[in-house]
A protein has these predicted regions:
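C-terminal regulatory/oligomerization modules of transcriptional regulators
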Residues: 75-141
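Short, charged, low-complexity amphipathic alpha-helix
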Residues: 64-74, 78
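Context-gated lysine
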Residues: 2, 8-11, 22, 72, ...
Length: 141
């Protein structure tokens, strides 16, 4: 199948498919005599796997590690389980960061008196004066 057909069956854009190829997550397909990419069912399964991992907020490196394990399976799936544990820890960290972010936003919102003119807006003043948190939020990566 050509790239457009693969995109259609996987509900993915052709740009995303090319991106996954360039990043090494999706193997490069063979090409026909007209130099069109020719994909097979293995590409379809792998692309669905990648997209499912991305829907679980897994990074490309996590997906790459899972693909390596999938391509060269060990005697058991303990390595896969370990990777999933690591990802769960990342999700827990992100949840805590989001809770802290929500608390900051709620605090800012409490500074607002709706009847104030914009020059006296507590939210805008708070955004100008609050301490900048140097901590990088994982959801911005």
């Amino acid at each position: 199948m050509k790239i457009g057909e693969l995109a259609k069956v996987t509900k993915c854009t052709t740009e995303t498919i090319r991106y996954y190829e360039k990043s090494g997550l999706l193997p490069m397909p063979e090409r026909n005599e007209s130099n069109y990419r020719l994909y097979n069912q293995t590409h379809e399964y792998r692309l669905n796997f990648i997209r499912n991992c991305r829907s679980l907020a897994m990074s490309h490196e996590e997906i790459r590690s899972l693909l390596i394990l999938m391509d060269k399976p060990p005697a058991d799936c303990s390595d896969v389980n370990y990777l999933l544990d690591e990802h769960i820890n990342h999700v827990d960290t992100r949840l805590q960061e989001l809770i802290e972010l929500k608390e900051q936003l709620n605090h800012l919102q409490q500074q607002c008196q709706n009847e104030d003119v914009i020059d006296h807006c507590g939210i805008l003043q708070g955004l100008q004066t609050m301490e900048h948190n140097e901590k990088k939020h994982s959801h911005l990566k």
